[in-house]
């Protein structure tokens, strides 16, 4: 194989992730790579919440078109931004080792969520984060916050918010870990499906490339991500509903924790299940939660 072209978004975090994959391909597979950057609709439309403009697929469409048009061979994404159902002909070819999956509380004035005064303004556009925050602290005011990591931090620093919630993984990768005031316990805020995992997307028809990329695959990330995504798929969850799922692997046993909540955080359902088949485990836990009224909670 002469060279692999990797499609990437333009943000610093996206390029960190893409360069991480590029370096692994070059060093471990001995295949030269180039990066092709592009803006996606999700990067351009910043004045509306994602759930109002088409969801997470808006961060991927342009990259997928580049692959279909032979302008790129693979694309690199944050798995939490990848919908549970990919367009026909695409697949997830390789999962990278997981970074810290927890949400991060970032504030210049307060040390933790518990320290926030009544009525404090917290920035996040994630319905999952909003619902869990309001469930824990219903006296907070949650305001939308879009943009890349640097944009969000500058809005906090300008005094627009008392605190903001980001993914710990992104801050760690950008060497901004000192900005994290509190790693939010999963008991308070269960992470998004796939949070902390970088994934490689490829075309199903490209068997030779898939075989090579598979050599980079992290088995643990692949298994926990499969369980989380199977849960999400069974519930048909996107960014328009408050769903969280987080799996841990111990030997061959997977512990899957999941949460669904109403958007105001007043109703919340949490369950966990243990199993060794990730797809089956995700589906079974979703079915159990559906039987317990998950859909009614998500619709309220």
Curated annotation (Swiss-Prot):
E.C. designation(s): 2.5.1.61
Co-factor requirement: dipyrromethane
One of the protein's GO biological processes: protoporphyrinogen IX biosynthetic process
Superkingdom, natural source: Bacteria
Broad class of enzyme this protein falls into: transferase
PROSITE patterns: PORPHOBILINOGEN_DEAM (PS00533)
Any one GO molecular-function label of the UniProt entry: hydroxymethylbilane synthase activity
GO cellular component, one term: cytoplasm
Catalyses which reaction(s): 4 porphobilinogen + H2O = hydroxymethylbilane + 4 NH4(+)
Cofactor note: Binds 1 dipyrromethane group covalently.
Keywords of the record: Porphyrin biosynthesis, Transferase
Pathway: Porphyrin-containing compound metabolism; protoporphyrin-IX biosynthesis; coproporphyrinogen-III from 5-aminolevulinate: step 2/4
Sites of S-(dipyrrolylmethanemethyl)cysteine modification: 239
PANTHER family: PORPHOBILINOGEN DEAMINASE
Note: The porphobilinogen subunits are added to the dipyrromethane group.
Functional summary from the UniProt entry: Tetrapolymerization of the monopyrrole PBG into the hydroxymethylbilane pre-uroporphyrinogen in several discrete steps.
Subunit note: Monomer.
Classification via HAMAP family: Porphobil_deam
Similarity comment: Belongs to the HMBS family.
Name under which the protein is recorded: Porphobilinogen deaminase
Organism from which the protein derives: Francisella tularensis subsp. novicida (strain U112)
């Amino acid at each position: 194989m002469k060279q692999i072209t990797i499609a990437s978004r333009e943000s610093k975090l996206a390029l960190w992730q893409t360069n991480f994959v590029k370096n692994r391909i070059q060093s471990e597979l001995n295949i030269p790579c180039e990066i092709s950057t592009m803006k996606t609709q999700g990067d351009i439309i910043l004045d509306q919440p994602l759930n109002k403009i088409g969801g997470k697929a808006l961060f991927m469409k342009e990259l997928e078109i580049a692959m279909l048009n032979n302008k790129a061979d693979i694309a690199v994404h944050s798995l939490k931004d990848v919908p549970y159902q990919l367009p026909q002909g695409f697949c997830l070819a390789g999962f990278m080792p997981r970074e810290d999956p927890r949400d991060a509380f970032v504030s210049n004035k307060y040390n933790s969520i518990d320290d926030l005064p009544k009525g404090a303004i917290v920035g996040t556009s994630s319905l999952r984060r909003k619902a869990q925050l309001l469930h824990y602290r219903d006296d907070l005011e949650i305001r939308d916050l879009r943009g890349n990591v640097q944009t969000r931090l500058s809005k906090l620093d300008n005094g627009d918010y008392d605190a903001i919630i980001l993914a710990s993984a992104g801050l760690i990768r950008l060497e901004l870990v000192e900005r994290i005031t509190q790693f939010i316990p999963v008991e308070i805020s269960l992470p998004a499906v796939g949070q902390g995992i970088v994934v490689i997307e490829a075309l199903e028809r490209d068997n030779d490339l898939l075989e090579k990329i598979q050599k980079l695959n992290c088995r643990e990330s692949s298994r926990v991500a499969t369980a989380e995504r199977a849960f999400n798929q069974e519930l048909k969850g996107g960014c328009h509903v408050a769903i969280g799922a987080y799996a841990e692997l111990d030997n061959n046993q997977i512990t899957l924790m999941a949460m669904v909540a109403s958007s105001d955080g007043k109703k919340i359902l949490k369950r966990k299940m243990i199993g060794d088949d990730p797809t089956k485990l995700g589906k079974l836990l979703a079915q159990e939660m559906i039987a317990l009224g998950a859909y009614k909670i998500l619709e309220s």
